Amino acid sequence: MGKIIGIDLGTTNSCVAILENGNVKVIENAEGARTTPSIIAYTNDGETLVGQPAKRQAVTNPQNTLYAVKRLIGRRFEENVVQKDIQMVPYSIVKADNGDAWVEVKGQKMAPPQISAEVLKKMKKTAEDYLGEPVTEAVITVPAYFNDSQRQATKDAGRIAGLDVKRIINEPTAAALAYGLDKAKGDHTVIVYDLGGGTFDVSVIEIAEVDGEHQFEVLATNGDTFLGGEDFDIRLIDYLVDEFKKESGINLKGDPLAMQRLKEAAEKAKIELSSTQQTDVNLPYVTADASGPKHLNVKVSRAKLESLVEDLVQRTIEPCRTALKDAGLDVSDIHEVILVGGQTRMPLVQKTVAEFFGKEARKDVNPDEAVAVGAAIQGAVLAGDVKDVLLLDVTPLTLGIETLGGVMTGLIEKNTTIPTKKSQVFSTADDNQGAVTIHVLQGERKQAAQNKSLGKFDLADIPPAPRGVPQIEVTFDIDANGILHVSAKDKATGKQQSIVIKASSGLSEDEIQQMVRDAEANAEEDRKFEELAAARNQGDALVHATRKMITEAGDKATAEDKATIEKALGELEVAVKGDDKAEIEAKMNALSQASAPLAQKMYAEQAQQGEGAAQGEQAKSADDVVDAEFEEVKDNK
């Protein structure tokens, strides 16, 4: 069995890790970094860039550079958070035929799982380059508060990337695994506070020793899947835009290039203000008007940044309170607080968390890598390489069905340990009702319409009977990934209907298969592009070497030699500018043949010169010989 890698598929950055010889190794990518920006760019020459190369060109290509796409995964276009996102990003978010939020690049609509799959492919390749063998299996993390649609969409992204997703695991749970595996024996309860680039989660986790086994039991989880570092950046960007408008009268909001530069500068300033009290945001030539170019230069203090984002930090406290209440615990019952996610490096976040929980958070957990490390440990557990770990996770939201009067009736309550199965008997609402529609919902509201619709299916051919007589047993079954399977059975006839919830939105099996094929075709395209680039480089090198040879040959090259070589050179230079690899190789061969006679002539001449020089050296050394007398000395020891 091959290795099962652990992937933290983040909103802002992603990370991949593997368990090797009992230790978890976070794997560096091709650029030498341990985390990879979750950014994908589509260039004008048809190349797809992922990670740092995509981030570097974002300023000049904002409309075709996609970031924070995880915030759209498994979401409907009409959702408020999506409408809010549309106002914040320079790329185009569009409504798919099924009502989902998709993105559009260069006139082509793409599903968020397709975009996330590009990041996963980069993670997969990073692991393969390190291990020297193909990788096909992975554990991928998601925010604990992701609903069923978002989990399913993440699994789909893995399939599109060519990965068999062995388990979807919650990010705070993964971080607790990374923290708790090597800790002292005995039971203790930890809070994992995970504030990442786009999502916020908090989980109450009990780490216990049961018969020599590490047991990680999630007692409760809560969160906000649209709150993270990106929102902190936006507050600072808005402030910088306002300051610039006050000074110059120009609103930068309508200029995508300027806004992309501002985004980068704001992120950099935010990071700097975690370790300094003040920083300058300096963007020369940010825009221009009739009077000439304009420069942005704004001083930002840590206090100013904190005042801009204070309410965002406070928004994280209510989920903490709810999670504790759901777990039936007080703040005093918490032994350790673990901070995960890059945004937790902000001093205000650390101070607020410490004040609420009455204790400083631990500093020995790497907030950027802990989640991937935990995913790798879970991968090793599934592969059988780690034996003494048991993970008991929960479903984050209540699952139920719509019943008479538009009411949501819960079958599986939030924070129920998974996997789990629950059945309940329902009946018909009308006399002689021949079919019932099972409308599956997820959420905490009593009104069905206020919750997330996961899907509908019909149970037909119910024998005629007065209302309330037929007995229809609805069974909810949640697997270890937190993904729901629902069935309904007429107890009188034994007739059964079931679905794996694919959400009323989501990707169909055909769409996923098509995207898998597209991804494979893209991999082939990428390979061809690399080969073409290599051929162009070889062609350029040969042109350079041949011109150098002609220069060095001087008078030794006849006019005929030069004419033949120049013709072949010109043809190769034209071929190198084209896109035909075979043509480049053919013209390289032609140039090699055309220049061969001159090369041989020069080689022969060099050889002759070499021989002449060698003979001269020999004669010289013969003249320099000095006769000497030697006396043998015997060494008596």
UniProtKB/Swiss-Prot annotation:
PROSITE patterns: HSP70_1, HSP70_2, HSP70_3. Keywords: ATP-binding, Chaperone, Nucleotide-binding, Phosphoprotein, Stress response. SUPFAM superfamilies: Actin-like ATPase domain, Heat shock protein 70kD (HSP70), C-terminal subdomain, Heat shock protein 70kD (HSP70), peptide-binding domain. The modification Phosphothreonine is found at residue 199. Induction: By stress conditions e.g. heat shock. Residues 604-619 have a biased composition (Low complexity). GO terms for molecular function: ATP binding; ATP-dependent protein folding chaperone; unfolded protein binding. It comes from the Bacteria. Residues 604-637 are annotated as: Disordered. NCBIfam families: PRK00290.1, PRK05183.1, prok_dnaK. Acts as a chaperone. Belongs to the heat shock protein 70 family. This is Chaperone protein DnaK. It comes from Pseudomonas paraeruginosa (strain DSM 24068 / PA7) (Pseudomonas aeruginosa (strain PA7)).
